[in-house]
């Protein structure tokens, strides 16, 4: 099956965060593609990617970026697909700069912004499953199963002292 989710990042170093997105998409059985697309270094490539995404069969774009983090917003400006922004944790400001860059979008160009770092990367994949589930019931079921397993794991291990 061709990719339904595009996972893009501003630089190769962002893979340490976005790899968690890929891992969760794999667990959910959602087909995806991965690409480095920089809003600042390769803006023409970004515009082309965003403009052609829907025609290539993508239904959701997950965009992770650190620092100025313009990738999710610029991507959202060039597509009508849902764009999920993942702020990458930076050494300088711990990702708060990225979070604020992604979350403060002007009205009319929405970006669904997730948490900073690994949690946001994982949740972006889960949110993708929720979005895709309306059209593709197998991803809704995969998400339900993931949540049930998560609940079961907690209930099976109520004492944190048990290894």
From Swiss-Prot:
Catalyzes the conversion of N5-carboxyaminoimidazole ribonucleotide (N5-CAIR) to 4-carboxy-5-aminoimidazole ribonucleotide (CAIR). Substrate binds at residues 11, 14, 41. This is N5-carboxyaminoimidazole ribonucleotide mutase. InterPro entries: PurE_ClassI, PurE_dom, PurE_prokaryotes. One of its GO terms (biological process) is 'de novo' IMP biosynthetic process. The lineage of its organism: Bacteria, Pseudomonadati, Pseudomonadota, Gammaproteobacteria, Pseudomonadales. Pathway: Purine metabolism; IMP biosynthesis via de novo pathway; 5-amino-1-(5-phospho-D-ribosyl)imidazole-4-carboxylate from 5-amino-1-(5-phospho-D-ribosyl)imidazole (N5-CAIR route): step 2/2. NCBIfam families: purE (TIGR01162). The gene is purE.
